[in-house]
Amino acid sequence: MNKEKSLLIDYVDPFIGTTNFGTTNPGAVCPNGMMSVVPFNVMGSADNTYDKDARWWSTPYEHTNCFFTGYSHVNLSGVGCPELGSLLLMPTTGELNVDYKEYGSKYKDEQASPGYYSNYLTKYNIKTEVSATPRTGIARFTFPKGESHILLNLGEGLTNESGAMLRRVSDSEICLLYTSDAADDMQCVD
């Protein structure tokens, strides 16, 4: 009889600690990596139990929430302080709308494993998938036919950034300058 081999990674559940003030998130992250790509579901809807603007909140994700406003990049997991959680990337379809309270979507079919996260945005019929490498994050959005958009929200995030600028360096590189209420200096992300 052949037994399937189990790998240690098969026992990892990224959803542990994502509710009840555990402050962890199920996002895609590479061990010792610079980038973490995390579902951001803590702003923009009265349907959410926990909203970062209604109370002090220290994580970009809460498992019991149901309203998704994008993937944040550069996150801390499990630390309990409301820092980073910025650079929100959100796929949409239909007419362009840039108000996160209106463009956000409920989601279903959430899946997470080490280095991978996906969900299905019910408002737009979009499957979203993200992964991470030691230096970057990658996203794949499966759109239905018709008009579609990928929004980059530089003005909202876990810490409510107070300023940002995006500069296209080349076809494959952008430079982002942003500042948050907690930092006085501008930072560049390539």
What does each model-found stretch correspond to?
Residues 1-180:
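Accessory carbohydrate-recognition regions in carbohydrate-active enzymes
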Residues 178-190:
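Single conserved hydrophobic/aromatic residue that forms the stacking wall/gate
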